[in-house]
Each structure stands twice: as C-alpha cells, then as structure tokens.
Amino acid sequence: MSRKCELTGVSVLYGNNVSHSQRKTRRRFEPNLRSVKFRSDITDEVYRLSVNARCIRSVEKAGGFDEYILKANNDVLSSTARAIKQKIIDIKAVESL
C-alpha cells in the first residue's frame, strides 16, 4: 500500500535534515496516515479509507463525508474514492427524479 491519502492525494515528500553545522542529509517526510471508517448518509454504507489527519478534520469541517467527497476534485481522489463519489452521484440523481 502506498503512503498516500486517498482523499487529498498527499504523499511522501523528500527534503533534508539540517544540523547545527548546516550539514545536510536526505530524509523523507511521510504523511500522518490513519485508516478511518467514514459513513455515507446517502449510500448508507461504511467505507474504510487511508487518509491523513488533516483530511479527517477537513471532512468534519465540510459537514460530513458525503459533502466533502462531492466537492473534492477527481484528480486527487484515489480510484476507490472516485468509485464511491460516482455511486453517491448516481443515487442522488435517482432520488431527484
């Protein structure tokens, strides 16, 4: 499994450790990933996704999982998240008819 958030696309960054004497050594900055269960009110299902800690706060701020994923850009979503988003869109379209 890659070290990448499924909702925001945040992945590993590379940089330097810099000592007091300005000696630089390469290092990795890994995202704070957590495996979290999100409940969709529209599909009435529970989804387990690997997301970073900031994304969890963003989902809560957006008003829930459904609202967040509908506003999210498809370019940063994983294939699993895109499939969930499409399922939510399809159900909302059927309900609006």
UniProtKB/Swiss-Prot annotation:
SUPFAM superfamilies referenced in this protein's UniProt entry, alphabetically: L28p-like (SSF143800)
The keyword Ribonucleoprotein belongs to this UniProt entry's keyword annotation: yes
Pfam families attached to this UniProt entry: Ribosomal_L28
MF (Gene Ontology): structural constituent of ribosome
Coiled coil feature spans: none
GO biological process: translation
UniProt xrefs under Gene3D superfamilies: Ribosomal protein L28/L24
InterPro entries: Ribosomal_bL28, Ribosomal_bL28/bL31-like_sf, Ribosomal_bL28_bact-type, Ribosomal_bL28_sf
GO cellular component labels: ribonucleoprotein complex; ribosome
Entry superkingdom: Bacteria
Membrane-spanning parts: none
Keyword Zinc found: no
Keywords, ordered alphabetically: Ribonucleoprotein, Ribosomal protein
HAMAP family membership: Ribosomal_bL28
Family classification: Belongs to the bacterial ribosomal protein bL28 family.
PANTHER family (UniProt xref): 39S RIBOSOMAL PROTEIN L28, MITOCHONDRIAL, LARGE RIBOSOMAL SUBUNIT PROTEIN BL28M
Protein name per the record: Large ribosomal subunit protein bL28
